[in-house]
Amino acid sequence: NVIVCGIRNISPQLSLEMAQLCVAYKGRGVIAFDLAGAEYDHPAKHHLEAFQLVRDNNICVTIHAGEAYGPESIHQAIHVCGAHRIGHGCRLREDGDLLHYVNDHRITLECCPSSNVQTGAVRDLASHPMKLYYDLGLRVTVNTDNRLITDTTVSKELWLAHTQMKLGPEEIGHIVLNGFKAGFLPFHVRQHFLREVSEEIEAIQSGNLEDHGTKPKARKVAAGDKSSAAKEAPSASDSP
């Protein structure tokens, strides 16, 4: 599945054309619309027409926000552009009221630890806010942002979350499940993946791999582009 991505610092007309492609290929491999690129001096609202088009056609939205700019960028992404998920969200911690709103409405944060260190959004992995967000109950996921430039994988990011950010095995399991809960997929598909992955996580954590093989099965990352994980009980339901 593909998430069509516009860029903040290109013409809003080009973003609209990307959104039109998103609508044209809905149900034929395209599942959502994204906006990435430089936040400073390139607010998401400049691309509002593109967001209105995809939302009018019941297409999900994710927006990179709160990485290189403050919580105002996250606020605009959610309340003006209608984002269902937020890419990065590092600076959400600067606005407690908005943080509570994101938590209460189960808006997923697509955390990208290694990339955030590389871009200077955080000083190092130890100072990354993902653990704080997890402890506060936000629906966080672990992502690569990009695999090539950052030279990483979701598995590597999960390992770093465990070794450098002090998230335990059970917490990592919750975070993995959040990636499937946040997936831009039909409800019944998410339910199917959640049941399978919940059983596999339980088997791995209990050491009972007889019914699951000696190696974990390869899984699709349900969040569509980059997700894997936050503080949710490892249940097969798709509820908060």
PLM segments and residue spans:
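Histidine/acidic residue-rich metal-binding segments in metalloenzymes
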Residues: 1, 13-32, 39-63, 67-82, ...
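Short, solvent-exposed polar/charged micro-motifs at secondary-structure junctions
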Residues: 11-14, 121, 182-184
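His/Asp/Glu-enriched, well-ordered alpha-helical/loop segment
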Residues: 56, 60, 78-85, 103, ...
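Generic, ordered loop/turn and secondary-structure boundary motif
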Residues: 91-93, 118, 123, 149-150, ...
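Mid-to-C-terminal alpha-helical segments outside catalytic/metal-binding sites
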Residues: 166-234, 239-240
